[in-house]
Amino acid sequence: ELFTVMEPDTLLDDFILSLRIAMQGYKIAYCTQAYAIESGSADMREEQKRKVRIAAGGLQSIWRLRELLNPFRYGMLTFQYVSHRVLRWSLAPVLLFALLPLNIAILLAGGSPVCYGTILALQILFYIMGGWGYYLSTRQVKNKLLFIPYYFLFMNINVMKGVNYLRKKKGTGAWEKAKRTKTESLNQ
């Protein structure tokens, strides 16, 4: 009875449906006995398909759920939505990529060389580690230390790609399913 028909081009129908139900005042409670097994993507190219689609759906949901941005009406639900989803899909990627040129500008404008120079050096080191992590992943070499900055940058780049995906895929909620690694059945 709480189900509502989604717009046909909805990318994250389960997410939007859940929040629309919560916006009506219902609590979302998950069954503790329910479980699902989902294997990881077959490779990073397949993972990119997922991340771009999820990011596009997240951006789409910001527009579709814009009423939820009203903290006077939805209180804690608004805070949870904005802090867990909206910032990650909108502001964080833009600010991440603005940090490098802004840090350089502050340093060139006479900002503290010790403070901003150190921050800039650490930032460049982080990007180099991410690039090196990417390079190693193309060679099927796994390095946890380098994978962390690589995956962080990978996720934020895919949010930016999600903007383009959303713009190009207007009118369709269909998406290409990412290939997955094989998962063993629990019944074996």
Where are these regions (language model features)?
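Intrinsically disordered, low-complexity segments enriched in polar/charged residues with Gly/Pro
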Residues: 25, 31-33, 47, 136-139, ...
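Membrane-embedded multi-pass helical conduit in multi-pass membrane proteins
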Residues: 38, 88-171
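Generic alpha-helical propensity signal that fires on short helical segments
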Residues: 44-49, 54, 90, 104, ...
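Membrane-proximal intrinsically disordered regions of secretory-pathway and membrane-system proteins
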Residues: 174-188
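Sparse recognition of residues in long alpha-helices and their boundaries
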Residues: 67, 102, 171-173, 179
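Catalytic donor/gating beta->alpha subdomain of glycosyltransferases that bind UDP-sugars
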Residues: 8-84, 157, 161-165
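Conserved nucleotide-sugar donor-binding
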Residues: 1-5
